[in-house]
A protein has these predicted regions:
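Phosphate/diphosphate ligand-binding glycine-rich loop within oxidoreductases
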Residues: 79-184, 312
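C-terminal helix-to-coil terminal segments
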Residues: 24-30, 322-360
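Positively charged, low-complexity intrinsically disordered leader regions
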Residues: 26-99, 103, 171
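Glycine-rich phosphate/diphosphate-binding loop of Rossmann-like nucleotide-binding domains
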Residues: 91-103, 185-266
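Short, structured coil segments at secondary-structure junctions
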Residues: 108, 138, 158-159, 215, ...
């Protein structure tokens, strides 16, 4: 089969899947009155949040706007998702992700069920498509935290209900949305602000790149040679940046990245699943530690960010993470509000615009 014919078949299949999801969603929300006191400007609809690319600039704007409204007026949304159920399958341990999804769903009037998959992969006992077709008959939305992005993409392909990426080896979209909500609260419009990320070009770095691009902001990512972000993610972010005016810089010098920046972000040098590389990484990454000396090179008003859990004494010192500049717990709190907005919008809480899906 030629590449063009194969691509056509994939496109046709993806289109049918979007129609199936929209039909299912419409059935769910028929006759339901929106619980929010006002419509959200520029609200989007997309079948899943597998990647930040699914949202695009309008979607990122909608999520962040609604998250701010929900944070300010939680009582207005207490029955927004009454009668709705979500299922969460986590192949990796979690504190913030699990509890913020559970608490968020309950605060919207719905229920959340958690399945611990840390002992085996989600598709270990049966075909992933079979799992998807079971789940779509029981719940309204599926949340996955997995080692492989392919697992999340496969679930989204087969399930007729929305699927949310709660972390994979490739992306962490919910985290990046919460991070930029935190920055918007601190600085307002991000158009003239710069985020410097130093460390491993991992899933968090990928989602920050894409979210920054959607917001038209500036991001500098400094990593050791060989640990740069995924080239396809970078290409996608730069494509979005052409539309929004965002500026993306990939560097190897952490000092160049941090100079004058408004926010300094780092993450673990060794992610879950990379334990065999820990000794080597611990030798390579020390120049990228965020300490008081590096923070001093940023703007005087700069904040320190970390998605947590932090390995104190490695990627960040106690003096920095415990300083007044640190907003790590604000980030953690905003996971709740960003994910509430995602749940609400993916379950039909606003006007729908044409779907935009990276995995379709």
């Amino acid at each position: 089969m030629s590449q063009s014919v194969a691509a056509g078949h994939r496109s046709q299949s993806a289109g049918m899947q979007v129609q199936k999801k929209e039909s299912t969603l419409n059935t769910h929300v028929q006759g339901r009155v929106a619980a929010a006191p006002e419509r959200v400007p520029q609200v989007f609809w997309c079948p899943d949040l597998v990647s930040t690319r699914d949202l695009g600039p309008a979607g990122v704007d909608a999520v962040l706007h609604l998250a701010g409204v929900m944070k300010a007026r939680p009582a207005d949304f207490r029955r927004a998702l009454t009668g709705r159920q979500i299922a969460m399958f986590f192949e990796k341990p979690s504190l913030r992700t699990r509890l913020t999804f559970e608490a968020g769903m309950v605060s919207l009037g719905g229920t959340a069920m958690f399945v611990d998959q840390t002992h085996e992969r989600l598709d270990a006992r049966e075909k992933l498509s079979d799992v998807a077709h079971n789940l779509e008959r029981w719940v309204d939305l599926i949340v996955l935290r997995t080692f492989s992005q392919q697992t999340i993409e496969g679930m989204a392909q087969h399930a007729s209900v929305p699927v949310i990426n709660a972390l994979s080896d490739l992306e962490h979209p919910c985290q990046a949305l919460a991070d930029y909500l935190t920055l918007l609260e601190r600085f307002g419009d991000m158009k003239d602000r710069c985020l410097a990320y130093v460390g491993d070009g991992n899933n968090v770095a990928h989602s920050l790149l894409l979210t920054c691009a959607c917001l038209g902001s500036t991001i500098r990512v400094a990593t050791p040679v060989g640990y740069a972000p995924d080239p396809q993610i970078v290409a996608d972010a730069r494509e979005i940046a052409e539309e929004t005016g965002a500026e993306i810089q990939l560097l190897t010098d952490p000092h160049e990245a941090v100079a004058g920046a408004d926010a300094i972000y780092t993450d673990a040098w060794t992610s879950m699943g990379q334990e065999r590389e820990e000794d080597e990484r611990t030798k390579i990454f020390p120049p990228y530690q965020v300490n008081a000396e590096l923070m001093a090179e940023a703007a005087p008003h700069a904040v320190f960010m970390h998605c947590l859990p932090a390995h104190r004494g490695l990627e960040v010192t106690d003096a920095v993470i415990d300083s007044p500049q640190s907003v790590v717990f604000e980030q953690a709190e905003n996971r709740l509000h960003a994910q509430k907005a995602i749940l609400y919008l993916l379950l039909g809480g606003g006007d729908r615009l044409p779907a935009r899906s990276a995995h379709a």
